[in-house]
Amino acid sequence: MTALFLMSMLFGLTCGQAMSFCIPTEYTMHIERRECAYCLTINTTICAGYCMTRDINGKLFLPKYALSQDVCTYRDFIYRTVEIPGCPLHVAPYFSYPVALSCKCGKCNTDYSDCIHEAIKTNYCTKPQKSYLVGFSV
């Protein structure tokens, strides 16, 4: 009985570790608006990692929904709002961004995720940088 229990426990831990590669990960993003004087550097968390998936050989005979593969995506998230410094009065200086609290492997939801294969490399500043100074949760 003890050996069976230990083997079950070991199997559960192994599967748990294999399935937990989709986790909240620290990410630095740069936010700027054309009208504002500064670029804001923000530290947040995003969902990143690997999900178990399989490629189906009989693609011609299956509906499109069966062909989608799981991606590492948000389970729970909140939005935070920051104020971009150096904006003129006629420009709204606020920017909201998601903060991942927990992640899951699932279908990519374009309502709140970028579902492209390779992102365009735009995470840089062209203006002087300011660190995240003012922010509040929405």
Curated annotation (Swiss-Prot):
* Superkingdom in the source lineage: Eukaryota
Q: Which residues are glycosylated?
A: 43
Where does the UniProt annotation place the signal sequence?
1-20
* Stored SUPFAM superfamilies: Cystine-knot cytokines
Q: Which InterPro entries match?
A: Cystine-knot_cytokine (IPR029034), Glyco_hormone_CN (IPR006208), Gonadotropin_bsu (IPR001545), Gonadotropin_bsu_CS (IPR018245)
The keyword Transcription regulation appears for this protein:
no
Q: List the disulfide bonds.
A: 22-72, 36-87, 39-125, 47-103, 51-105, 108-115
A GO molecular function assigned to this protein is:
hormone activity
The record's subcellular location field reads: Secreted
Which positions does the propeptide occupy? 133-138
From the UniProt record, give one GO term of the biological process aspect.
Answer: G protein-coupled receptor signaling pathway
GO CC field: cytoplasm; extracellular region; extracellular space
Sorted keywords for this record are: Congenital hypothyroidism, Disease variant, Disulfide bond, Glycoprotein, Hormone, Pharmaceutical, Secreted, Signal
Q: What CDD domains does the annotation carry?
A: GHB_like
Similarity-based family? Belongs to the glycoprotein hormones subunit beta family.
Q: Which disease is it linked to?
A: Hypothyroidism, congenital, non-goitrous, 4: A form of central hypothyroidism, a disorder characterized by insufficient stimulation by thyroid stimulating hormone of an otherwise normal thyroid gland. CHNG4 is an autosomal recessive form characterized by isolated thyrotropin deficiency that, if untreated, results in severe growth retardation and intellectual disability.
Give the protein's biological function: Indispensable for the control of thyroid structure and metabolism.
Write down what this protein is called. Answer: Thyrotropin subunit beta
Its taxonomic placement starts with: Eukaryota, Metazoa, Chordata, Craniata, Vertebrata
Gene name linked to the record? TSHB
